[in-house]
Amino acid sequence: MSEEKPQQSAEEPEPGEPKAKPAPEEPEPGEPKAKPAPEEPEPGEPKAKPAPEKTSDYYRISEKLPVRFNNPGWFHGYGTKEAVSMYRTSNQTYGSRAPTVHEMPKVFYPSSNKFSRQHAAFGMFQSHNINVTLEKSLVTGPDNHITHYDRLNFHPSYNVNRPSICD
């Protein structure tokens, strides 16, 4: 007595193997294609969060770029209560959301603080001269000086005895 295993058809998988999905039927010409149903994870499995986007995933970045600029997810917008759309300005919209990878800097140029250190040690330049110069008028030219005693001499056409025409 020999026991024979029943032959499995080519369509049935081995025990323990997942069942193969049937081939989608081709729609008739002129009919829209049906979208495949998204595969949902099994109820027991938690959904894995996607890794946060990095600027380096989309752009070539400088080697000297600080880490915070490669991770825009670290920044948060300054969200506030929604303003009435009639009164909303573009400035309010700009600061209310976190930046995307496309808005982050790709290159970083650090600046020296040599200027600030020098002024912290010695202070700003101060002129101790006495202010005795006369003001030169841009209206009358460099030859005419406006002084404290001749304030009405600001333009050659200002003369009550003659018409107001420049000589």
UniProtKB/Swiss-Prot annotation:
Induction comment: By p53/TP53. Protein levels are stabilized following gamma-irradiation.
Family: Belongs to the PIERCE1 family.
Keyword tRNA-binding: no
Quaternary structure note: Microtubule inner protein component of sperm flagellar doublet microtubules. Interacts with CFAP53, ODAD1 and ODAD3; the interactions link the outer dynein arms docking complex (ODA-DC) to the internal microtubule inner proteins (MIP) in cilium axoneme.
Name of the protein this chain belongs to: Piercer of microtubule wall 1 protein
Ranges of compositional bias, category Basic and acidic residues: 16-54
Knockout consequences: Mutant mice exhibit severe laterality defects, including situs inversus totalis and heterotaxy with randomized situs and left and right isomerisms. They show partial embryonic lethality associated with heterotaxia. The motility of tracheal cilia in adult mice is also affected. At 8 dpc, they have a reduced beat frequency of nodal cilia. 50% of tracheal cilia axonemes have missing dynein arms. Double PIERCE1 and PIERCE2 mutants show high levels of embryonic and pre-weaning lethality. The few mice that survive birth display hydrocephalus and laterality abnormalities, dying by 20 days of age.
One GO CC annotation: axonemal A tubule inner sheath
Task performed by this protein: Microtubule inner protein involved in the attachment of outer dynein arms (ODAs) to dynein-decorated doublet microtubules (DMTs) in cilia axoneme. Functions at the initial step of left-right asymmetry specification of the visceral organs.
Keywords, sorted A to Z: Cell projection, Cilium, Cytoplasm, Cytoskeleton, Flagellum
Lineage: Eukaryota, Metazoa, Chordata, Craniata, Vertebrata
Region: Disordered, residue numbers: 1-54
Pfam families on file: PIRC1_2
Entry's localization field: Cytoplasm, Cytoskeleton, Cilium axoneme; Cytoplasm, Cytoskeleton, Flagellum axoneme
Main location: cytoplasm
